[in-house]
Regions:
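RecA-like P-loop NTPase motor core of helicase/translocase proteins
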Residues: 1-166
Length: 166
């Protein structure tokens, strides 16, 4: 997941990643973008174009992906990345998320909710990774410290019991 600072940044990231995939012949991979409303930008030909989430998100057969279908589509093997602008930073319970690139200032509850998208367990998921281009570690740590509480265990626990639930 790439967390961007604006809808304009999201569509620009989208176009750059699409060009990269095409240039390097990653024909079996694709990306999805999530943002609300419509945004205008200048394309490579110098023309003003209006973009929407549905207009950009297409299946291999060319059909458009509606917003209501986005979460389901993300589960398909070809979608390796989701680029977001003020979407899916809260309440997006997706265990498949492993890596997050953050290019947006975060603090407080927004930082906790956004970064916590990665903390869901999934079969085969051993760790997570965050590459943050926009935030200082001490601000993120302070954001989490508000919610941090010490937990004392009365006895030894078996961490593998978590996987039995999956």
């Amino acid at each position: 997941m790439v967390v961007t600072a604006s809808r304009l940044h999201a569509i620009r990231y989208y176009h750059e990643f699409k060009r990269y995939l095409e240039r390097h012949h990653y024909d079996d991979l694709d990306i999805l973008v999530a943002f609300s409303g419509a945004i205008k930008d200048i394309d490579r030909a110098g023309e003003e174009v209006e973009y929407t989430e549905e207009k950009l998100n297409k299946r291999a057969d060319g059909t458009h992906i509606k917003e209501s279908q986005l979460k389901e589509e993300f589960h398909k093997d070809e979608y390796a990345m989701l680029i977001v602008a003020e979407k899916y930073q809260t309440g997006f319970d997706e265990p498949l998320l492993h890596t997050m690139f953050v290019d947006k200032p975060l603090s407080g509850v927004k930082a906790v909710q956004t970064l916590s998208r990665l903390n869901r367990t999934a079969k085969g998921k051993q760790d997570t990774f965050v590459l943050d281009f926009a935030n200082k570690p001490e601000i993120i740590q302070a954001s989490f410290s508000t919610y941090y509480r010490t937990t004392l265990l009365s006895g030894e626990t078996d961490p593998n019991k978590l996987y039995d639930l999956i």
